[in-house]
């Protein structure tokens, strides 16, 4: 995955059956697909084309999902919405009853409002959320039971930007067996969902 971005949000579903994932997406968006308000294209996506998504919700949502040879038991998800179409991901997860991870990373030198997020939900829908973001000031927020791989000492640091940042998120992902730099490598299957009308 590219390291040159202002903002990047993606999700990871722990599921090996990509066809089941696609069928679940089709069920969730059945009405939009039948009425021609949306289309699903079977294609190998270019995830780097989805970095720096737009903020707000005035544009038509699009998202891309793929599976690669490096992580055959994972499906990756990225969208054209700054918040990563998080609610869509949660709906998919509830249908599949699988683990999901959502990460948001920022380049503090490129954006006025950096946002860092690590979210994990297991198949029982138990949630863990950690966030550090800047509005008028820096804010750190966490909820849910800490996971075994977390370093809780990070959250005691004085500077909020040292409690959760790109490096810590990447570290946590490595501990979960995922190198962010390789999630878009050796893609073997993918789809793109495009909403065309409201």
Write out the residue ranges for each language-model feature.
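Surface-exposed, low-hydrophobicity interaction/linker segments
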Residues: 27-54, 123
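Short, extreme N-terminal segment that most often corresponds to the first beta-strand
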Residues: 1-35
């Amino acid at each position: 995955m590219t390291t040159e971005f202002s903002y990047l949000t993606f999700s990871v579903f722990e599921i090996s059956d990509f066809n089941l994932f696609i069928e679940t997406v089709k069920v969730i968006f059945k009405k939009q697909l039948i009425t021609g308000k949306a289309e699903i294209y079977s294609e190998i996506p270019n995830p780097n084309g989805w970095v720096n998504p737009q903020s707000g919700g005035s544009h038509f949502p699009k998202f891309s999902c793929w599976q690669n040879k490096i992580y055959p038991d994972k499906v990756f998800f990225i969208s054209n919405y700054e918040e990563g179409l998080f609610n869509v991901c949660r709906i998919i997860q509830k249908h599949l009853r699988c683990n999901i991870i959502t990460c948001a990373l920022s380049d503090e030198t490129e954006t006025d409002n950096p946002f860092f997020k690590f979210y994990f939900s297991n198949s029982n829908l138990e949630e863990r959320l950690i966030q550090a973001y800047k509005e008028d000031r820096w804010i750190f927020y966490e909820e849910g039971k800490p996971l075994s791989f977390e370093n809780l000492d990070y959250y005691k640091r004085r500077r909020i930007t040292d409690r959760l940042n790109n490096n810590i998120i990447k570290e946590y992902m490595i501990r979960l067996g995922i190198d962010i730099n390789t999630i878009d490598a050796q893609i073997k299957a993918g789809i793109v969902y495009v909403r065309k009308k409201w």
